[in-house]
UniProtKB/Swiss-Prot annotation:
Pfam family, any one: Methyltransf_5
Keyword S-adenosyl-L-methionine: yes
The enzyme's E.C. designation: 2.1.1.199
Subcellular location: Cytoplasm
Keyword Ribonucleoprotein on entry: no
InterPro entries (alphabetical): RsmH, SAM-dep_MeTrfase_MraW_recog, SAM-dependent_MTases_sf
Gene from which the chain derives: rsmH
Protein name: Ribosomal RNA small subunit methyltransferase H
C-alpha cells in the first residue's frame, strides 16, 4: 500500500518508544497532542497492544493521513480535530506526547506558505481554514519596530531591525509581497555577501518568527505545559520533542519548576549521528520526559 502523502519519518522514535516502556501500566490511554501523520502513535500502538489513542490535530490533511496510517488499529484510535490547547480528555492518560515541529509535508506544500524554498502565498497558518491572520496580513499590520522586535524575539535573528526596515520599505513601494519566495529574497538581501555557503538559509529565522507569531506557537505550548499534568494519571508521563531553543527552554523550565512533575531526562535526548544522516530533520530535535508525581 502506498504511503500517505503526509507521511514522514518520526524523529527520536527510539526515545519515544523507550518512554512507552516506562508507563505505569501497559493498558490505558495515550494522548498524541500533535498527531501529524501518526508516525509516533503507530509505533506506540504496535509496541503496546493495550494502548488506546486519542490523537489531536487541527490540520485536516494531517488528520486524513493519520486516519489512513492508523486504520489497522481500528477502534483503539480516536482522532479529534482540535488544537491541543483547547482540549480536555475524557479520562486520565498514561502518557501525553507532543512533537512540536512543522512536518516535512507541511513545508513541502508551497500553498501552505511555510517554505522559503518553494514559492507560495504568505499564509503560514497551521489551520489553513481558520480565521486567524496570515503572515502577509501580520507584516502589513505591524509597525517597523514591532516587526523587528517580533523577528528578534521569535527568530533570535540578529539582523532583525535591518530585515524589518527592508520589509516595510518594500511594502511601501510595491505593496504586498507576491509570495514566500519574494519575502525570502528580500530577507537574504539584508545579509552581507559570503564566500562559503551558509549553514542555514538567511530567511530561516525570519520565517520561523512569523510562523510562531501567526500560530501563537509559544502561547499554545505554554498552555499545553500547564494542562498536560492534569491530563495524566499519577505516574503518567509527558514527553515533548522540540526543535528550537525557544521551545526547549520552556519545556525544560516547566519540567523543572512544576511541582506536579518529576524530571526523567536531566538533559535532552538528541539524535544519533546515524539518525541525523538518515533523517536530517532530526538534527535540531530534543526530547524531554517527565513523570507526574504519585499522590501521597
Amino acid at each position: 500500500m502506498p504511503a500517505p502523502l503526509f507521511s514522514h519519518v518520526p524523529v527520536l522514535s527510539e526515545a519515544v518508544m523507550d518512554a512507552g516502556r516506562q508507563m505505569p501500566r501497559a493498558e490505558g490511554l495515550l494522548i498524541d497532542a500533535t498527531l501529524g501523520g501518526g508516525g509516533h502513535s503507530a509505533l506506540m500502538l504496535e509496541q503496546q497492544p493495550g494502548l488506546r489513542l486519542i490523537g489531536l490535530d487541527q490540520d485536516a490533511t494531517a488528520r486524513a493521513a493519520a486516519a489512513e496510517r492508523l486504520a489497522p488499529f481500528g477502534d483503539r484510535v480516536t482522532i479529534v480535530a482540535t488544537n491541543f490547547a483547547e482540549y480536555t480528555p475524557p479520562e486520565p492518560a498514561l502518557m501525553v506526547l507532543a512533537d512540536l515541529g512543522v512536518s516535512s509535508p507541511q513545508l513541502d506544500v508551497a500553498e501552505r506558505g511555510f517554505s522559503f524554498r518553494l514559492d507560495g502565498p504568505l499564509d503560514m497558518r497551521m489551520n489553513a481554514v481558520g480565521d486567524g491572520a496570515t503572515a502577509a496580513e501580520l507584516i502589513d499590520r505591524l509597525e517597523e519596530n514591532e516587526l523587528a522586535d517580533l523577528i528578534y524575539a521569535y527568530g533570535e535573528e540578529r539582523l532583525s531591525r535591518r530585515i524589518a526596515r527592508r520589509i516595510k520599505a518594500d511594502l511601501a513601494v510595491q505593496g504586498a509581497y507576491s509570495g514566500t519566495a519574494a519575502l525570502a529574497y528580500a530577507v537574504a538581501g539584508c545579509y552581507p555577501p559570503q564566500g562559503t555557503p551558509r549553514r542555514i538559509h538567511p530567511a530561516t529565522r525570519t520565517f520561523q518568527a512569523l510562523r510562531i507569531a501567526v500560530n501563537d506557537e509559544l502561547g499554545v505550548l505554554d498552555r499545553l505545559l500547564q494542562q498536560a499534568p492534569d491530563w495524566l494519571e499519577p505516574g503518567g508521563l509527558v514527553g515533548i520533542i522540540s526543535f528550537h531553543s525557544l521551545e526547549d527552554r520552556r519545556v525544560k523550565t516547566a519540567f523543572l519548576r512544576d511541582e506536579r512533575l518529576e524530571r526523567i531526562t536531566r538533559k535532552p535526548v538528541v539524535a544519533t549521528e546515524e539518525e541525523e544522516e538518515a533523517n536530517p530533520r532530526s538534527r535540531s530535535a530534543k526530547w524531554r520526559l517527565a513523570r507526574k508525581r504519585l499522590i501521597d
